[in-house]
Amino acid sequence: MSGAASSVPRICVLFALPEEAAPFLRRQAAVPALGRCTVVVSGAGANKAARATAKLLADGPIECLIVCGFGGGLTEQITPGSLIVAERVLDATGENAETPKICRPDRAMLERAQGPRGDLVTVGKVLTTPGEKQALHARTQAQMVDMETAGAVAVAEQAGVPWLSVRAATDSVDEPLPFDFNALADAEGNIDRGRVVMAALTHPWKIPALIRLGSHSALAAKNLTRFLEACLQQWPD
């Protein structure tokens, strides 16, 4: 993102991770509808997403904000690669953990985004076991979980910026993650690749599950870009 302030309202697309954004960025040069978007990779977690959104606002007017990336499935209907367009975002981070705060996207943006809808809940850590995911669904009835959306959209709402959230699943509700990625994060909360490699080397029987998660993540990123491309090509100029 350029450091110079813009006077032209921008369509801003916020990802958390480089892996989420990579297919979108590769398509930007070839697809004018994507080329007009300002893309930001915030880093993992609601606080980083909130700070990145505040920085976008400081850089100039925003026409709309699309918060997107990976999520975890909380129901049997959500399989790796599945998408949801969030009808509601439940903030279950920090003090809202027991009584989530509810945010709703811009109605016009939601209507333009032709895709499967559902509720998305934002939490403060990676859910690594089926039990954790099942318990969160029982408490919130959400279809998918992430770690960023609530932070970004809270800032957007305060500024009066219309927003939309789209998530693609990397894991199903009954699928445990190969490692506790919370324990493999660095001081900034981002997954440390070196720690992941060491964990794989010391737990080689988990390598197939790690490879499978990588394949699911690649599928989710591809499906997410395909959806965003179709959606943004119909966006009004």
What are these regions (language model features)?
Residues 6-12:
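Extreme N-terminal starter segment of soluble prokaryotic enzymes
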Residues 17-18, 149:
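Helix N-cap/beta->alpha junction signal
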Residues 14-16, 40:
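Short hydrophobic segments within beta-strands
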Residues 12-14, 66:
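Conserved beta-strand elements of the Class I
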Residues 26-237:
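Glycine-rich phosphate- or other oxyanion-binding loops that anchor nucleotides, phosphorylated ligands
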Residues 1-3, 14:
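Protease-domain processing segments flanking chymotrypsin-fold serine proteases, especially trypsin-like
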Residues 20-23:
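Short, charged/polar "capping" segments at the starts of alpha-helices
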Residues 4-5, 92:
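Absolute N-terminal positional cue centered near the fourth residue
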